[in-house]
């Protein structure tokens, strides 16, 4: 519609299949924002991870697809939407503002170069009392030196330029080395 190919992907409900990474790579995607492997620092996704209830977790190999991590704690849906039998959806916006503000303040103090990625749905955050909370939060964030509001794509371009895959793998073996993790 805009004449541009999509560069990034966020999975509905943050679900991945065994084919998701293959498809994103095949269609030239640069980043994903559906996984929770870190709180605020991006990383390269791995292809071929294997999980078993009886064996150690096995890491696959890192691929040239940047993950901009998400978290349920920075998603508007769980606290604000009613799902019968699961949650009331009636959390006060001021309670969520306190949580989101606290997460931002911690990241700003302790996670240099990180990204604070809120997940918001227009039908959820777009109600008057919630929009007022969001305005206060954005004003708070904007009041901090060194904060930039930008698209995930622009952030990923800068991050990739500073963290080429091969160098990143060498500097982050805890994410990058294929093979078993943990005890059986």
At which residue positions do the language-model features occur?
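Alpha-helical structural signal in soluble globular domains
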Residues: 1, 23-30, 136-140, 144
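Active-site-adjacent pocket scaffolds in enzyme catalytic domains
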Residues: 4, 10-111, 168, 184
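C-terminal domain-boundary segment and adjacent tail
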Residues: 90-184
């Amino acid at each position: 519609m805009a004449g541009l190919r999509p560069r990034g992907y966020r999975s509905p409900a943050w679900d991945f299949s065994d084919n998701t990474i293959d498809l994103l790579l095949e269609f030239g995607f640069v980043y994903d924002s559906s996984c929770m492997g870190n709180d605020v620092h991006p990383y390269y996704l791995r292809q071929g991870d294997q999980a078993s209830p009886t064996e150690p977790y096995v890491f696959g190999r890192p691929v040239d697809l940047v993950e901009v991590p998400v978290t349920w704690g920075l998603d508007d849906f769980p606290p604000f939407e009613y799902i019968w039998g699961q949650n009331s959806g009636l959390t006060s916006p001021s309670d969520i503002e306190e949580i989101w503000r606290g997460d931002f303040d911690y990241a700003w103090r302790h996670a240099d170069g990180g990204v604070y990625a809120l997940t918001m749905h227009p039908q959820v955050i777009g109600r008057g009392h919630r929009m007022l909370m969001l305005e206060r939060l954005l004003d708070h964030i904007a009041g901090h030196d060194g904060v930039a509001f930008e698209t995930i794509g622009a952030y990923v371009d800068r991050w990739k330029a500073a963290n080429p895959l091969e160098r990143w793998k060498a500097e982050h073996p805890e994410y990058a080395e294929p093979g078993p993790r943990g005890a059986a």
